Amino acid sequence: STSEIAIIDKENKEINIQSDNIIICTGSEPVSIPGIEFDEEKIISSTGALSLKSVPKKMIVVGGGYIGLEMGSVWSRLGSEVHVIEFLDHITPGMDKEISLEFMKILKKQGIKFNMQHKVETIKKSNSGAVVSTVDKDGNKNNFDCDVVLISVGRKPNTEGLNLESTGIELDEKKRIKTDKIFKTNVHNIFAIGDVIEGPMLAHKAEDEGIAVAENIAGQSGHVNYDTIPGVVYTSPEVATIGKTEEQLKQANTNYKIGKFSFMANSRAKAIDDAEGFVKILADEKTDKVLGAHIIGPQAGELIAEIGIAMEFGASSEDIARTCHAHPTFSEAVKEAALSVDKRAIHS
């Protein structure tokens, strides 16, 4: 039935629940490399990386995306020798390239080692840990020994085992549930949100979608502005991004202008000796409307919210620049970057 779900409780009893509307939000799980299984001891997922019993002497992270770098950064700061193996020539695919390059430079200074343009062929467990075999861009074969290998190459939606086929719900080629603009599936009373539908697998995206779908079911006009959903890498320093990247604007032939401001010139960052990184704001060349922003540095995940509000209300970089920011705060770097869009930064 499309109006009833069956669940198994902790006592292994089946419970049937009826409802006029059903929302599927079963999340996602880590994926591995084909032919390689997680044992969560020597070959681990991001879930296993949260519960290691001791600090590994050497950890290899397969994948240079958000989650792999977050986990690698944590274990590096705890004392592990961390090596990142990435198939592409840069980390954090999809991120503004200038930020990505600065990010890798900072992580290298912290001692994390990077092996770029390496394709993983096999991962085999050994007595002491595991051996990762790769082929680099020149066709050379390489073997990397480690105590633990963290595979962080993506996640997949949890849509298997739900008996969705009995309802006729349509999935796409990535096993995500197809929905319309109000999160409704092809079945009139079943909706889906979060990691099981298209879009970035982010908790705050799912939360906003959950609110929107509840509003829609209640007869209101819930919606999510996907252009203003931030992404944050919780490393040290943090990295945050929202809106368009410079590469996306170039590809779309959009005329834009750039404002940048370094935390080296921010008094709060200097005072706490955490002044690496910068704020980058992209604005439309003609209208000055903020199109995107990218931050690497202290409290980047907090600072990006200001840009999100500005973009939600269609603000210009001048609107941000004319807003008084308290001194001394990290947020002054955002104001200065906005001033820099028109080459008016004060402390650059």
Where is each model-derived feature located?
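Glycine/serine-rich phosphate-binding loop and adjoining beta1-alpha1 elements at the start
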Residues: 2-42
